[in-house]
Amino acid sequence: MSSFEYPQDLRYLDTHEYVRLDGEIATIGITEFAVDQLGDVVFLELPDIGDLLTKGDTFGSIESVKAVENLNAPITGTVVERNEILVESPEAVADDPYGEGWFLKVRVNDPDEVNDALTADEYRAEVEGE
């Protein structure tokens, strides 16, 4: 079995982004599984505060020594905060992807959109089958 964490309070995309909804603010990042697959992260491109994310669209990219991957929005809303620590030191995402390793905080347009994303159990089944 896998040693990856799948926090129950998150929703997941099959492209390995997660979203944590707290009222009308969503925190977005990538999963521990994604961090493991990427290896050493060397660059992170994130949108600016005030930018609009549209669910399903690309909002940035993450680059490792192995690959460059697009980041996909799990929810629609306006960026209200971005993790500047990760922009400066992207490798830090590996230390705590579900905590201090978040990418963006977004004021959501429709909180119910989060229900379209995978539950922790659905995501676990998806990645453990990969």
UniProtKB/Swiss-Prot annotation:
Residue span(s) of domain Lipoyl-binding: 25-107
Taxonomy, superkingdom: Bacteria
Signal peptide: none
Keyword Isomerase on entry: no
Modification type N6-lipoyllysine: residues: K66
Annotated Gene3D superfamilies: 2.40.50.100
Keyword entries, A-Z: Lipoyl
Family membership noted in the UniProt record: Belongs to the GcvH family.
Entry function: The glycine cleavage system catalyzes the degradation of glycine. The H protein shuttles the methylamine group of glycine from the P protein to the T protein.
The protein's name in its UniProt record: Glycine cleavage system H protein
Lineage: Bacteria, Bacillati, Cyanobacteriota, Cyanophyceae, Nostocales
